[in-house]
Structures are given as C-alpha cells and as structure tokens.
From Swiss-Prot:
HAMAP family: Formyl_trans. GO terms for molecular function: methionyl-tRNA formyltransferase activity. Belongs to the Fmt family. Pfam families: Formyl_trans_C, Formyl_trans_N. This is Methionyl-tRNA formyltransferase. InterPro entries: Fmt, Formyl_trans_C, Formyl_trans_C_sf, Formyl_transf_N, Formyl_transf_N_sf, Formyl_transferase-like_C_sf, GART_AS, Met-tRNA-FMT_C. The keyword Oxidoreductase does not apply. The keyword rRNA processing does not apply. It comes from the Bacteria. Keywords: Protein biosynthesis, Transferase. (6S)-5,6,7,8-tetrahydrofolate binds at residues 113-116.
Amino acid sequence: MSESLRIIFAGTPDFAARHLDALLSSSHQVVGVFTQPDRPAGRGKKLMPGPVKVLAQENDIPVFQPKSLRSAENQELVAALNADVMVVVAYGLILPEAVLSMPRLGCINVHGSLLPRWRGAAPIQRSLWAGDAETGVTIMQMDKGLDTGDMLRKLSCPITADDTSASLYDKLAQLGPQGLLATLEDLAAGRAVPEKQDDAQATYADKLSKEEARLDWTLSAAQLERCIRAFNPWPVSFFMIDEQPVKVWKASVIRQQSHATPGTILDAGKQGIQVATTDGILNLESLQPAGKKPMSAQDLLNSRREWFTPGAILA
C-alpha cells in the first residue's frame, strides 16, 4: 500500500466531479477543493453551485472559489493547505507558476485527449469532428504551457460511428478516474516515469462557438455528420429556414453523388430529409425547430412540409 497523499482538487463541471468522487473513495485525503464561482442558471438566473462544489460540501471538504489565483492572498490559500499534490480537472482557471510548484509533487491534470493531439479547450468535440479513430485521457504533470507538460499516463478508447460528444464524455469520465488513481499510486511510490510530449505532433482544440455549429453544405456529408455528433449536446448543429434556426440532432450519410447545388433538398419522407452536399447526401433524421422539442423528420414534415420542398435550397 503506497502512502496516503494530501490532495488539493481543482475542478468545476460534472466531468471533474466524477474524478473527485473517485478520490473521495480512495485512501488519499482531499484537504481542499478549488472551483469556479457560482454562476447564474435557469430562467430565474439564480446563482447555482457547480457539481464539484456540491460534492465537496456533501463531504465537508473546505471549498475555495477565487476568481483568479494570481493574487498573493489567493495563492496563500493553496500554500496553507500543505498538499502533496494538486489535481486539476476542467477547472477553468489558469494556474500561475507559483501555484504549480507549491505542492511537493506539483500539479497534475487529467486532459480529455491523447496528448499531444488536441491540446486546448474542446478536445472531445475536436476529435469527433476530425474523424479520429480513437481518443482517451492523458494524465500530465502541469507546466506553464497550454497542455504541454510531461505525460505520466495515457488511456485510450475507440471512437465509434455513433459516438456523440455526450457519449464520448461519459467514456472518458470513466477512464479518467482510473488513470488518475493509478498515477497517484505511482507518484506516491516514486515510480512515475514522465514522458516528454512531441511538440511537432501537437494539434489544438479551439473552444467551440455557436457560429461554428451552423451547417456548411459545401462540406462533405461525412464531415457534416461528424459535426452533428461533435456538437451534440452543445452547441448543436443547425441550419436556417424562414429566418429561424432548425437544430439537427441526428443524421446519416447516403454514399451516392448528387450534382445538385450543395444545400438542395433532394427528397423528404419518413426516412429523413435528404440534402445535397459537396460529396454525398446528408439524411437529416432528428430535428428541432425553434421553440419545439427534438422530433423525427417525419413529425417535422407533418407540420412544416412547405419548408422542405424538393429543389429548395437550405441556408
């Protein structure tokens, strides 16, 4: 049995909370939790705590919510906890160099990709969008760069043809805690072997934007279908019709060529709404008009068939 480590945990969303939960079930001691300030949520815009804060409070762990860790006062909060290591998972704040070196074993991060591929804010979505065959998690020793630290452990999983960002998120939320606990065991026993990243192989996962979710019919059907899966559950791919956005939750690729202008509706029936692209045909299967719930193509056609007349061009 390796030594029990004093751990500071820093994270905010559900993905992070699943890692904190694993730590709470381990032999290690979580001595403090750093998480982002409460945010307005819901129709009433009431301040709501994130999943990590809720879990920490349920377990009587001290919670700290600074807007930044740049001030000496907030850095002293970290130092006073006298931690062996700081575990960072989707925290959302940059750690200054002074904080990175405070714990005896430094700070480690769980990142949702196989580094150095997809450094940055949206690795899960970008791996899907790019058509990668696999992804995974990397546990790394943090340094001052953006996801550039030495790698301590990598765990991989395949990306299937029907994975969405939501399903991939769940897969990585199971892999991550496994890798984290194994890495902490290695660190505690002094047997961790850091591996340098090859910067020449690095790619960057830029943050998603709502504008980017608009379907560009000049892409191939395969690219658009991946885009739809990558942007599910947020921000959700869409096209415009009658100056209204229509979200697309599910689509499939028909591997035959059309010589119609990209965006042209070729057919519309109970199997879906078929749209021409630069390469192949995209079959829209689950859609959501503004103000409505997601529905099948057939249900949408029952109420809005005039939107999808063959020969019309979608914006």
